[in-house]
Design a protein with these regions (language model features):
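Positively charged, small/polar-rich N-terminal and surface patches that mediate targeting and assembly
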Residues: 1-147
Length: 147
């Protein structure tokens, strides 16, 4: 049985071609790539070794085994552990809406669906919001005000 995770990789935009090639070479043909503008304060950027600039964000659904291979490659080939190169991390997923979308997202990865269980109580949840251009300040104000 396999657990699935959302892998998030944030890097500079000039690394687009390198990361696309890397993900395909490591058996990850399905990923979302989008541009981003950070809202983190400078202390947070310093902690993760990021600079204030326009960023590139890659999102992919990976299994635990795929993440192990990718993590090694991100360090040895992409040098993601070097400050200023970027950051990559995974977030466990508790649910994916439907069998077909799940099969598409884990395309070419070895995956055996686990038995369905009830949602677990957790200390934190990640909420992903997609907003139209010009509304980022409104969304971030609401997120910061949430308790």
């Amino acid at each position: 049985m396999s657990k699935v995770y959302m892998m998030v990789t944030i890097t500079n935009r000039n690394k687009r071609k390198d990361f696309r090639t890397f993900f395909k070479e490591y058996g990850l043909p399905v990923f979302l790539e989008t541009t981003g503008r950070g809202t983190a304060q400078s202390e947070v950027l310093d902690y993760f070794g990021l600079e204030e600039s326009e960023k590139l964000l890659f999102l992919a659904i990976v299994t635990g085994e795929t993440w192990k291979k990718l993590r090694r490659g991100l360090i040895t080939k992409m040098l993601i552990d070097v400050p200023g190169t970027g950051v990559s991390f995974i977030v466990p997923l508790s649910s994916v809406g439907g069998r077909k979308p799940l099969q598409f997202l884990v395309n070419e990865q070895e995956f055996e669906k686990e038995e369905e269980t009830a949602m677990k109580d957790t200390d934190y949840e990640l909420l992903v919001a997609i907003a139209n251009q010009g509304y980022i300040d409104t969304v971030m104000d609401a997120a910061r005000a949430a308790k």
